[in-house]
A protein has these predicted regions:
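Non-catalytic alpha-helical scaffolds and adjoining flexible linkers that form interface surfaces
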Residues: 1-21, 25-243
Length: 243
């Protein structure tokens, strides 16, 4: 079926001399893999740089059920970035987010609210001039709402523990080891209440930010089967070291 849809590039790998296999999250069909031919002519509409992580595209594709690699008929940039490719901090964050989405969205079917959340988040990061050091933390924590394991924050009481396995705040620690002590549980519930416009109010040290990232990734590994250790984490953890 010939389909026109918005798409976000998650990952691309070279396949032979002139082709790429590109994983995308599409608004119309969810997660799909495409085989893309790269013409040698510089005048071609299809450019290799279109398939950098998190690039937002408008594609026309022949989408067929049960086909592993779909074919793209036409492609253009939907939202050209103005800062992400040129800002080292934003670029590091975007590469982490792309790797995270590549694993978190495996098998994801059409989910328009989730697509819109991811797209609007990327555009926010691109437009922001400052105060985005906590972006990746808020992005991960709020995305759990769309994947079905966002905790009920209304039940939180100061001094509660946070059960990572059951996504619950509790007055006493659970019987297993996957939980946070009250001090860290309080920080997590604060971050989950924040959005991009208010997250700058949450002041953290470099060590605290990295610890919350570690907690968020443990949380995802508990709830998403086969969610791996992410290679880009080490680079992300070096950001804002002086802060």
């Amino acid at each position: 079926m010939l389909t026109k849809t918005q798409a976000i590039v998650l990952h691309a790998i070279k396949y032979g001399e002139t082709r790429l296999i590109v994983d995308m999250f599409t608004r119309a069909h969810g997660r799909l893999s495409f085989i893309v031919s790269l013409p040698k002519s510089p005048k071609s509409k299809v450019k290799k740089q279109y398939f950098q992580p998190l690039t937002m595209l408008e594609i026309e594709a022949d989408v067929r059920p049960k086909v592993q690699l779909q074919k793209i008929r036409d492609v253009r940039l939907a939202e050209p970035f103005s800062t992400i490719p040129f800002d080292p901090n934003k670029l590091s964050i975007s590469l982490f987010v792309a790797e995270f989405l590549y694993h978190a969205l495996r098998g994801e079917q059409q989910n328009v609210p989730l697509f819109d959340y991811v797209a609007s988040s990327i555009l926010w990061l691109d437009a922001q001039q400052a105060s985005f050091a906590n972006f990746h933390l808020v992005f991960l924590m709020r995305m759990s709402r769309f994947l079905g394991f966002y905790p009920n924050l209304d039940n939180y009481v100061s001094g509660d523990y946070f059960d990572l396995r059951e996504s619950m705040f509790l007055p006493t620690p659970p019987a297993h080891r996957e939980f946070l002590q009250p001090q860290e549980a309080e920080k997590v519930q604060l971050m989950m209440r924040m959005d991009y416009s208010t997250m700058h109010l949450f002041q953290m040290s470099h060590a605290e930010r990295n610890r919350l990232l570690e907690v968020a990734l443990v949380y995802y590994r508990l709830h998403l089967p086969d969610f791996p250790e992410l290679k880009s984490v080490s680079v992300l953890q070096e950001l804002y070291k002086e802060r």
